[in-house]
């Protein structure tokens, strides 16, 4: 019996031939001739799955990994544009199945690449995270060493983030483990460069949803119940578009694709390492297009988005039973349908000599001001349902944490009980959030801005723009709508990507988790500055032609 996947691939092949015959290939206009360059493209990937137990990132208490559901990867795409009249330019984009990209991971990748391949401009490397909540933690938290010292707590530096030695691979060790492999993937992608072309397109898949529910009293809550009598509406917009960048070799054979989607990979949660729905998506796309295809995921602005279905939750669960597909499998199929549905037209629109420009800039953003009212107002939060001020939270949790820490010191046998670490790490996590908020109140008196790195890239008539935040969707929509480019990919949690949430004014007023002072370094004012400066940088890639 003929495999349905072989039939699908054969149909795609015929469609590609038909579309190639009927549609013109893209070409650079006369005004872009000087900036156009012959492309050389290279792909590589590396397995960054830890070889022993780690703390899993994401959430408000430590989780210790209990095995591997599926591997996590670094996927690298190297693009170099060589020009007849002028210098070449480049970018190496690397997607990581991690919750974020810490500054220390980014710098260690740069150091290793610089040493192994000095011809690579390491400032042109972009690392972005898929924001899976089932991957190793990278948090080293040197600032919390100060908190511990101030209060006479002797916590090993390697375990400052969680407040106690958890007896597994420390974050610092995993960072070195991952950096070595990520740097190797960067080098391999660079060495694999060959002449090729790109095409870009827009498709749609219903996947991510706004995760904030708003109520008639003006408040909103993350994952709040929608079946309450006072439920008013979902707080914000949802973006079901997919930005798709296809890469081709000189013979017009597909080599890989970049998928830009406004949804973090947060279906899975538990104690097993997983790439989340990107594992299912890779499998599905490779079944359709070939095992050799590379897939590079990017999260668009999605700080207030999630795969979780709130309004139609019961209907969605019923459909999973009827179809026999898990939510991750269903997402993988939807993304794959969207990516393959426009493939014939992408094959007919390959650009081998697009305009290519890459700028890296440091943008100064005003820090979110922590007011005295922020510190003294008594309120509950998503992770702390007690009604108390930030200072009261800190004082209470410090006493609780010190008591627990002392118990483990005096009775180490307590660490043999299953889940012994949950309560102490949850307490310490909330304690650290309160302490950092108090520290920021003092810091802002002398340091009012936060510098962030932004990449903007032009490839033909498309643009890519990065930021280090969990950027609320509205800002991404503003950038896409106002951009000079025909199509713009906004990439959050990138290079490095540890800026915290960047919420809208609407969300700040609602008071949900991602918009409170404890969760945010930058507020809505900084969000508008980021949008405007990003747009200026994108426009400069076109204005230089004038």
What are these regions (language model features)?
Residues 11-22:
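Bacterial N-terminal signal peptides
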Residues 28-546:
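Non-catalytic substrate/cofactor recognition surfaces at enzyme active-site rims
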Residues 1-12:
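Bacterial N-terminal signal peptides that target proteins for export
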């Amino acid at each position: 019996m003929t495999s349905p996947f072989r039939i699908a691939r054969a149909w795609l092949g015929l469609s590609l031939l038909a579309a190639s015959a009927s549609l013109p290939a893209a070409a650079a206009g006369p005004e872009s001739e000087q900036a156009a360059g012959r492309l050389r493209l290279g792909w590589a990937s590396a397995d960054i799955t830890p070889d022993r137990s780690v703390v899993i990132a994401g959430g408000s208490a430590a989780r210790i990994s209990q095995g591997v559901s599926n591997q996590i990867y670094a996927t690298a795409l190297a693009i170099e544009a060589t020009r007849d009249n002028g210098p070449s330019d480049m970018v190496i984009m690397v997607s990581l199945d991690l919750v974020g990209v810490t500054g220390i991971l980014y710098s260690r990748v740069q150091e290793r690449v610089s040493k192994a391949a000095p011809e690579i401009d390491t400032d042109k490397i972009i690392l972005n995270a898929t924001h899976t909540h089932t991957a190793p933690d990278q948090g080293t938290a040197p600032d919390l060493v100060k908190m511990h010292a101030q209060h006479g707590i002797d916590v090993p530096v390697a375990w400052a983030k969680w407040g106690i030695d958890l007896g597994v691979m420390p974050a610092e060790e995993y960072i070195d483990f991952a950096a070595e492999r990520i740097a190797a993937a960067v080098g391999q992608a660079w060495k694999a460069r060959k002449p090729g072309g790109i095409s870009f397109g827009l498709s749609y898949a219903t996947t991510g949803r706004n995760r904030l529910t708003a109520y008639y009293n003006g408040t909103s809550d993350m994952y709040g119940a929608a079946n309450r009598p006072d439920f008013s509406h979902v707080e914000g917009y949802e973006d079901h578009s997919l930005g798709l960048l296809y890469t081709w070799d000189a013979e017009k054979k597909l080599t890989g694709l970049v998928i830009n989607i406004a949804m973090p990979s947060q279906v899975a949660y538990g104690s097993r390492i997983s790439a989340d729905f990107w594992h299912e998506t890779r499998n599905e796309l490779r079944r359709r297009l070939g095992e050799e295809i590379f897939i590079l995921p990017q999260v668009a602005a999605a700080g207030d988005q999630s795969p979780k279905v709130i309004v139609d939750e019961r209907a969605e669960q019923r459909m999973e039973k009827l179809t026999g597909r898990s939510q991750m499998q269903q997402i993988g199929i939807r993304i794959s349908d969207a990516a393959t549905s426009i493939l014939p037209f992408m094959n007919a629109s390959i650009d081998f000599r697009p305009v290519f420009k890459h700028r890296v800039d440091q943008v100064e953003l005003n820090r979110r001001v922590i007011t005295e009212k922020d510190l003294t107002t008594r309120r509950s939060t998503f992770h702390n349902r007690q009604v108390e001020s930030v200072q009261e939270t800190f004082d209470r949790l410090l006493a609780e944490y010190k008591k627990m820490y002392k118990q483990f010191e005096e009775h180490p046998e307590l660490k043999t009980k299953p889940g012994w670490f949950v309560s102490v790490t949850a307490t310490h996590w909330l304690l650290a959030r309160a302490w950092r908020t108090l520290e920021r109140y003092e810091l802002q008196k002398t340091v009012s801005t936060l510098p962030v790195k932004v990449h903007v890239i032009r490839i033909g008539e498309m643009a890519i723009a990065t930021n280090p935040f969990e950027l609320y969707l509205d800002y991404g929509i503003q950038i896409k709508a106002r951009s000079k480019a025909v199509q713009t990919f906004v990439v959050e949690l990138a290079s490095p990507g540890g800026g915290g949430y960047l919420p809208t004014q609407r969300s700040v007023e609602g008071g949900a988790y991602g918009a409170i002072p404890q969760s945010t370094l930058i507020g809505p004012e900084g969000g508008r500055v980021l949008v405007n400066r990003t747009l200026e940088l994108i426009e400069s890639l076109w204005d230089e032609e004038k």
